[in-house]
């Protein structure tokens, strides 16, 4: 009574019906029925602005518009063509011109060309994080995860991993349950990190004309892979058990602090650019050497020079190379005899059931283990050598043009712009039997879900603190990526035509095994929860 008298006139009880602005917004964005559709729409808009159709083509993507400029002007006219012109004017040796222009600048330029898209994407994600929306997504995902025996704590490393997989893996330390922590370490890198964005941008841009749904689907495929893997792993003895409790405070919605947003965007973008200036430069030099040198008919040297010697490259030898590569004789190129082609061609057989069993995407995939940026850098180097110049045609008569010596006049191609990515698309279409888009999508899925770069693998080893668990994680990631890509390619061909019966049966068996693991009873977890 005495306390009540003291509080009277000082304390005013808030009415039950009064809701804050954040509460009113949360009634919609965290609604059990509307939360996921709203999240899907938000992410679609994020990727539409960063990786969709360019504003120059009637779309809304600022990132793609800037990336097109970067590829054509920065990568092509300035870095590759500019450096070549300067070096040739100085009288530099051809091999040095090739190393710097076709190797270093072509590889680094191909990667840096996608920086504008990444910066726009990081800016959008930082805005969502700073305004308080992404915290709600963690709350929503916890509600969904818990239904499948997973913890919402696993979603936090996933959010961190959108910038880089290494801090994402390290963020799993906040999970107390050892089994949940190990499972999170294994699956966090499924989410597309900054280094994987150029791969998404390449496939969405080169094969799908800047399609927004391709880029958006890559993000949700990563989330789906985490959820599906979590459910399957939770039903094994190694990971069974009740999920760790997840408690977090939801901040009130607020206007983003631009200082924080720009700082976060810059930090993520700068870490990517630094890698391009270190790891990518070194890797580009190695890839240039492997694609430039090789053994041609028993002679070792630069393959371009050796192929100009008719005494070395005879018709019989071209027939042998064509048979080895599985291509027509008129499509044989100097690079088919390079060291990289010789090594990657046998390995490419492994990826034939996935739709991209050619040595070039195989080489790009394998080098992607060093750094995921290397996938695009590798394409930039290989297709910079492989620019298909066509014979010039008289615009009035339509006749082929020749010079005074009777040699065909070839049209000039952009060395590191749209032409390279058009050649990538043409090759995917060729080696997949006319199913280039499906093969490229399968290629993208595999490279998004397979083992991460060496640096992230090192982080996994530190967090696992076990060589056995590290190899298990790498094996699971590569195996899961292979199976999903196999299913996508084989079932996709069922609808696009030209299906392979054996491949289709194998894909259906894999799909059935995944469904069985997903829906089988959760016995081990029930035992643990009762005890």
List the predicted regions and their residue ranges.
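Switch/coupling subdomain of P-loop NTPase systems
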Residues: 1-19, 24-26
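Hydrophobic core segments of alpha-helical transmembrane domains in multi-pass membrane transport
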Residues: 38-49, 121-126, 204-206, 219-234, ...
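Conserved phosphate-handling catalytic cores of large alpha/beta enzymes
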Residues: 167-244, 380
């Amino acid at each position: 009574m005495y306390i009540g008298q003291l509080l009277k006139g000082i304390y005013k009880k808030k009415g039950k019906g009064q809701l804050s602005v954040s509460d009113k917004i949360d009634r919609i964005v965290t609604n059990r029925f509307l939360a996921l559709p709203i999240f899907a729409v938000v992410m679609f808009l994020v990727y539409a602005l960063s990786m969709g159709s360019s504003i120059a083509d009637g779309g809304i993507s600022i990132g793609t518009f800037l990336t097109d400029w970067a590829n054509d002007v920065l990568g092509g006219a300035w870095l590759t063509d500019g450096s070549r012109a300067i070096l040739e004017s100085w009288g530099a040796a051809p091999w040095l011109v090739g190393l710097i222009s076709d190797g270093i600048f072509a590889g680094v330029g191909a990667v840096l060309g996608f920086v504008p898209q990444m910066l726009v994407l990081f800016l959008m994600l930082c805005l969502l994080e700073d305004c308080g929306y992404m915290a709600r997504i963690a709350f929503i995902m916890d509600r969904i995860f818990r239904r499948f025996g997973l913890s919402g704590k696993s979603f936090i490393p996933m959010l961190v991993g959108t910038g880089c997989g290494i801090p994402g893996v390290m963020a799993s330390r906040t999970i107390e349950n050892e089994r949940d922590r190990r499972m999170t370490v294994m699956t966090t890198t499924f989410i597309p990190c900054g280094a994987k964005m150029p791969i998404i941008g390449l496939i969405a841009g080169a094969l799908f004309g800047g399609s927004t749904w391709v880029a958006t689907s890559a993000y949700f495929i990563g989330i789906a892979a985490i959820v599906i893997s979590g459910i399957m792993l939770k039903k094994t003895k190694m990971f069974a058990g009740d999920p760790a409790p997840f408690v977090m405070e939801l901040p009130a919605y607020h206007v983003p602090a631009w200082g924080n947003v720009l700082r976060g965007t810059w930090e993520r973008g700068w870490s990517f650019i630094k890698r391009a200036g270190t790891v990518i430069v070194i890797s580009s030099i190695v890839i240039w050497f492997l694609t430039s040198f090789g053994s041609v008919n028993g002679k070792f040297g630069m393959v371009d020079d050796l192929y100009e010697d008719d005494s070395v490259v005879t018709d019989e030898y071209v027939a042998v190379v064509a048979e080895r590569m599985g291509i027509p004789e008129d499509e044989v190129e100097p690079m088919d005899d390079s060291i990289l082609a010789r090594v990657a061609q046998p390995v490419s057989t492994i990826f034939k059931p996935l739709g991209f069993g050619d040595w070039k995407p195989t080489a790009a995939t394998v080098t992607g283990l060093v750094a995921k940026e290397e996938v695009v850098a590798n394409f930039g180097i290989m297709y910079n050598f492989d620019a298909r110049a066509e014979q010039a045609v008289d615009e009035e008569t339509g006749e082929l043009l020749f010079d005074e010596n009777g040699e065909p006049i070839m049209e000039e191609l952009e060395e590191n712009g749209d032409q390279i990515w058009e050649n990538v698309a043409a090759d995917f279409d060729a080696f997949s039997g006319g199913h280039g888009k499906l093969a490229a999508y399968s290629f993208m899925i595999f490279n998004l879900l397979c083992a991460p770069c060496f640096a992230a693998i090192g982080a996994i080893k530190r967090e696992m603190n076990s060589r056995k668990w590290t190899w298990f994680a790498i094996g699971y990631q590569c195996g899961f990526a292979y199976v999903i890509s196999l299913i996508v390619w084989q079932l996709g061909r069922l609808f696009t035509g030209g299906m392979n019966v054996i491949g289709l049966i194998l894909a259906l068996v894999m799909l059935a095994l995944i469904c069985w693991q997903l829906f089988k009873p959760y016995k081990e977890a029930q035992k643990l929860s009762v005890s």
